[in-house]
């Protein structure tokens, strides 16, 4: 019996981590994207041919190629843009707060797990 419980716990662990990461996205990351990025990168406008409404769009990326490499923020174009490290600086104008940048960085490091808050039907906030 104990052994059964042990195996059940093992099987449940990855699912729990996934849920936790999805919640991290919905509560911490999605609000940043909604507020600062979605106005220009949505299904209608697609600035630089990239929309931020789902994970696939970011993995596929825009005219420059993939915007995020899950697990590897240092090689993710999106992070370089947020940090104003290169020619591409996002959002245009003043950079995000250090805290917001670290939240997005942590999210990519943890595998860039998506939640339910942003999807194809999400419309940008006016
Ligand atoms: C005011 C409109 C606007 C906002 C807000 C904005 N972007 Fe952009 N974004 C653009 C434009 C325009 C380009 C194309 C720039 C270029 O090609 O030089 C672009 C390009 C990009 C690219 C490169 C895509 C590619 O493959 O060429 C990334 C990544 C990106 N933005 C991320 C973001 C992120 C992350 C945010 C939010 C923090 C954001 N953008 C907010 C207008 C915007």
Placement of each model-derived feature along the sequence:
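Sec-dependent N-terminal signal peptides
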Residues: 4-13
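Aromatic- and Gly/Pro-enriched helix-to-coil junctions and flexible linker segments
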Residues: 15-126
């Amino acid at each position: 019996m104990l052994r059964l419980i042990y195996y059940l716990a093992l099987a449940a662990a990855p699912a729990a981590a996934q849920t936790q990461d999805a919640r991290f996205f919905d509560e911490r990351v999605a609000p940043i994207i909604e507020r600062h990025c979605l106005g220009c990168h949505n299904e209608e406008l697609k600035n630089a041919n990239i929309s931020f409404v789902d994970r696939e769009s970011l993995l596929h990326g825009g005219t420059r190629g993939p915007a995020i490499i899950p697990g590897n923020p240092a090689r993710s174009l999106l992070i370089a843009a947020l940090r104003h490290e290169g020619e591409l600086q996002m959002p245009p104008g003043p950079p995000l707060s250090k805290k917001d940048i670290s939240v997005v960085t942590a999210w990519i490091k943890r595998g860039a797990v998506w939640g339910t808050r942003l999807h194809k039907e999400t419309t940008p906030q006016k």
